[in-house]
């Protein structure tokens, strides 16, 4: 009967161990899945870059092709936001697993930190690609306008695209030749493309702000945990010193008690000896 009770008592510990193993397995599976999505995201970034290079080289008179490129960028940003949300959720769950110098807690924090750094690197490269594509597209528009004897600066082009007045610059252009018509369509599509690109770049900037907050939050969590670990070590060391001091004081107290007892015994013997001699001197026959 006692054996059965013992087995039942041990069951919760085994169950907790199994739950911990399952939790760690789920965490690692989630990390692998996010890592796979990051690999796909990196490949998409490169594919978008190649599409932009092709667009700059071949022209953008085909509206459908420009729309396809913009849709690809929108899907990329949406996927990046989804990964960011998953990493934010994973970071919040880390509060349940305090970090230490070794162990699964440390491993969890390091895995999430590496994923955040990977996403940040991909998005940083993507932002550079978008800025470069925007600059090259603006140059294409400026080149077209100069061919039509319309001199404009890059800042004027940027301002005209942003406020929608770019087409006012082209109202006097003669489009009687089909080639000129194609060039104008290319410029018009690029201008529309740049306006969409501006919106996408702002979305990427917002995503970067969210990621910086996530990195900061992750860093603060790590700092708090590191501080707690350091304080715990300091408290443990102080406790050991207190124990050692208590042992030393206890030994000293015991030593002084023994010395005090011996001194009292010696003093008592001296008093008895002196009292015996004193009584022998005043009382005849006293020994």
From Swiss-Prot:
Residues 184-246 form the t-SNARE coiled-coil homology domain. Residues 65-97 form a coiled coil. One of its GO terms (biological process) is cortical granule exocytosis. The chain crosses the membrane at residues 263-283. One of its GO terms (molecular function) is SNARE binding. Residues 284-287 are extracellular. It is a single-pass type IV membrane protein. It is found in: Membrane. Residues 1-262 are cytoplasmic. Keywords: Coiled coil, Membrane, Neurotransmitter transport, Transmembrane, Transmembrane helix, Transport. The keyword Membrane applies. InterPro entries: SNARE (IPR010989), Syntaxin (IPR045242), Syntaxin/epimorphin_CS (IPR006012), Syntaxin_N (IPR006011), T_SNARE_dom (IPR000727). GO terms for cellular component: cleavage furrow; cortical granule; endomembrane system; perinuclear region of cytoplasm; plasma membrane; presynapse; SNARE complex. CDD domains: SNARE_syntaxin1-like. SUPFAM superfamilies: t-snare proteins (SSF47661). Belongs to the syntaxin family. Potentially involved in docking of synaptic vesicles at presynaptic active zones. PANTHER family: SYNTAXIN (PTHR19957), SYNTAXIN-4-RELATED (PTHR19957:SF310). This is Putative syntaxin-4. The lineage of its organism: Eukaryota, Metazoa, Ecdysozoa, Nematoda, Chromadorea. The gene is syx-4.
């Amino acid at each position: 009967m006692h054996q059965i009770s013992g087995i039942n008592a041990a069951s919760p510990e085994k169950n907790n161990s199994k739950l911990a193993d399952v939790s760690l397995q789920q965490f690692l599976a989630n990390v692998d899945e996010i890592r796979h999505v990051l690999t796909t995201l990196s490949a998409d970034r490169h594919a978008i870059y190649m599409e932009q290079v092709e667009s700059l080289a071949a022209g953008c008179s085909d509206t459908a092709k420009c729309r396809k490129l913009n849709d690809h960028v929108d899907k990329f940003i949406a996927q990046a936001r989804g990964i960011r949300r998953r990493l934010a959720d994973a970071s919040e769950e880390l509060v349940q697993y305090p970090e230490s110098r070794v162990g699964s807690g440390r491993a969890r924090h390091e895995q999430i930190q590496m994923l955040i750094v990977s996403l940040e690197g991909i998005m940083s490269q993507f932002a550079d690609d978008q800025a470069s594509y925007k600059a090259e597209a603006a140059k294409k528009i400026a080149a077209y306008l100069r061919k039509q004897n319309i001199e404009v600066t890059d800042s004027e082009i940027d301002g005209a695209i942003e406020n929608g007045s770019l087409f006012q610059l082209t109202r006097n252009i003669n489009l009687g030749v089909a080639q000129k018509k194609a060039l104008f369509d290319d410029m018009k599509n690029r201008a529309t493309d740049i306006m969409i690109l501006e919106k996408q770049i702002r979305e990427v900037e917002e995503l970067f702000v969210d990621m910086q907050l996530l990195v900061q939050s992750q860093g603060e969590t790590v700092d708090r945990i590191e501080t707690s670990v350091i304080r715990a070590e300091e408290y443990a060391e102080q406790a050991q010193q207190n124990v050692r001091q208590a042992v030393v004081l206890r030994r000293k107290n015991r030593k002084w008690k023994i010395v005090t007892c011996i001194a009292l015994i010696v003093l008592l013997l001296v008093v008895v000896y002196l009292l015996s001699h004193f009584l022998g001197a005043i009382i005849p026959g006293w020994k």
